[in-house]
């Protein structure tokens, strides 16, 4: 079986990705109304130093966009500004015409943010980590609805066959690095945000796991999500999965 976020390597070394099949055979018509516009004229650090300036971004649904640059170029800072975690001194970020800072309630639940940090509870299983997160997010849903939602996300991310394994610590390796990253993505994905901001999802992963994680994000974009990813030194195969690359 060709599972979600997986890769088949051909004899010549090139890859066939799950997202390729989604792109070829996905007949769903994307009707998502989504407009993301960022105008960042200037952002200063607390020291007063200018960190970001003259950035203009206008994107819609169904895109996987990378953010690349040298160490210290401000990639994560830009991601945080776009996600609304930092406020530009001059400029605005708007989703469907609503300012994400002054009209927060109008865009509530639209944004998802996945940091580099591992947020899993090592004593819990794969299923339990996502289940308890869902309980916190959906106090209005009954038990059956939560269980169905959790299993749907695990299946979509190819983690259903690992659901009863304890995740352990990052060094314990009870589940692979790629599976840990997918489960961290699931913690945000279960809320069904339309826009995802992901900070260095391939950090510390093998080349195969890195490809599988980006392939998963590509698959999500093909289903209508707008995804911004800070990426560091991607391979040529990973680079080609992005619809656009912002170089800093």
Language-model regions: role of each:
Residues 122-139, 149:
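Q-loop/switch helix immediately C-terminal to the Walker
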Residues 192:
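Conserved catalytic motifs of ABC-family nucleotide-binding domains
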Residues 92-106:
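ABC ATPase NBD Q-loop/coupling interface
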Residues 196-200:
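Catalytic Walker B motif of ABC-type/P-loop ATPase nucleotide-binding domains
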Residues 83:
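Helix-to-loop junction immediately C-terminal to a conserved catalytic motif
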Residues 68-70:
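The feature captures the beta-strand-to-loop junction immediately N-terminal to the Walker
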Residues 188-189:
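ABC ATPase C-loop
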Residues 145-166:
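Conserved ABC ATPase "signature" region
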